[in-house]
């Protein structure tokens, strides 16, 4: 990642490693830079002996519906920050506060349902990747935009923020 060669003797044995590339959602909206870097990494892994296969992962497309009533992140952030926000909201970035405050709307019943849905989702994803050693996907779909392009445009900020968080969210939800 740093553009520097890997020292000799530090390469993992990838002979016959079974790697899955999920094709649902995580490869959407890739910019040319990320797409080229990801493809290059996959080619290097394959050249080192890894067996790479693209697989459907429809469970990834289900995550927005699972999180429709709220997310773990919002609930946990609200539980931690609510006292500070109630007394010192101006010390927070307003964009961050708005997201944290979504956690206040999550009921106990919603949270318990979310826990159960997460367990079902994890089981489904684990069943789909059974037989693979790991999943491969870009961490983010695009190179991060310049901050100055987001400061004055709320829609651009939330669109970019959502894209940057999208792929890591799947792994976090898997407790990966």
Show where each model-derived region lies.
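Glycine-rich, small-residue loops and helix-cap segments
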Residues: 1, 106-176
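A short helix-breaking turn/cap at a secondary-structure junction
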Residues: 1-36, 40-41, 59-62
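A short glycine-threonine-serine/GTX helix/turn-capping micro-motif
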Residues: 7-8, 28-29, 68, 85-88
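Short helix-loop capping/hinge segments that flank enzyme active sites or metal/cofactor-binding pockets
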Residues: 13-20, 71-123, 138
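Short, well-ordered beta-to-alpha junction loops that form the rim of enzyme active sites
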Residues: 24, 57, 138-141
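Short glycine/threonine-rich loop-to-helix capping motif typified by GTGT followed
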Residues: 32-34, 63-74, 146-152
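Acyltransferase
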Residues: 33-56, 82-87, 111-133, 161
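Short connector loops at secondary-structure junctions
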Residues: 51-66, 100-101
